[in-house]
């Protein structure tokens, strides 16, 4: 057999196998929807069981079951449109604002079902904070950006207490030394990287248990990205962090576990080192090695 044909066969077989995994609607077949790896952890901060999300008649994510551990960084990776950001928004009910969105399944925070009718989404979103892809400071002073949450949630008993929360949050976000003499200036006057750390300080100020990050470094330069990644490592000693990222190198640097999503399904979850060096599913390997995605 010609050497070129021998070389080509593995790729041809992989392509055939990939096609067999897809049904006629271009979705994962039932046999490939079983998540590979270790999606569950002991004493989890958050648990998700059989979570489906529909936008009207369209199923965006299906049958997602995974835990978020205490004081861990969980990275979610996958091709654009695979459902990872949709799932992230389920964790603090950000999808509630979309009239066409329906979420089913169970998601708990410290054992409480966050979709129960008695749950108020305002305190929930304080407990499970969100940092978005594009920095979005309020058009207020740096001080007011950070103090806004503690004020409306009644976490400060007076001005001195509020000032202490602001300082502590900015210190945790690695921003205090850069802004301590300009707290009266607008948050929008900061650089992009500083604005993103300000948004992280704003989330920290209301004492969350979980911080969600949706591509937090995609709009930042490499230096600002490095600072945010260092900050994520520091914050993980106090909070659970779930980060969506397209940068696989970033996922490998900042997370303890990584989850791979594909076409609305959770394909594999496991220790980050294993996911990137010895994945258990062919779809994961193909994405990690750049064969598709």
Swiss-Prot record:
**What EC number(s) does its UniProt record assign?**
7.3.2.1
Q: Which GO terms describe its biological process?
A: phosphate ion transmembrane transport
Q: Which UniProt keywords apply?
A: ATP-binding, Cell inner membrane, Cell membrane, Membrane, Nucleotide-binding, Phosphate transport, Translocase, Transport
Q: What is its main location?
A: membrane
GO CC annotation terms, alphabetical: plasma membrane
Task: Report a single Gene Ontology molecular function.
Answer: ATPase-coupled phosphate ion transmembrane transporter activity
> Which InterPro entries has this protein been placed in?
AAA+_ATPase, ABC_transporter-like_ATP-bd, ABC_transporter-like_CS, P-loop_NTPase, PstB-like
Q: How does it sit in the membrane?
A: Peripheral membrane protein
Quote the subcellular location field of this record. Cell inner membrane
Primary enzyme class? translocase
Catalysed reactions, as listed in the record: phosphate(out) + ATP + H2O = ADP + 2 phosphate(in) + H(+)
Task: Please give the superkingdom of this protein's source.
Answer: Bacteria
Pfam assignment, any one: ABC_tran
ABC transporter domain location, by residue? 46-288
**Which protein family is it in?**
Belongs to the ABC transporter superfamily. Phosphate importer (TC 3.A.1.7) family.
Q: How does it assemble?
A: The complex is composed of two ATP-binding proteins (PstB), two transmembrane proteins (PstC and PstA) and a solute-binding protein (PstS).
Q: What is this protein called?
A: Phosphate import ATP-binding protein PstB
From what organism does this protein derive? Desulfotalea psychrophila (strain LSv54 / DSM 12343)
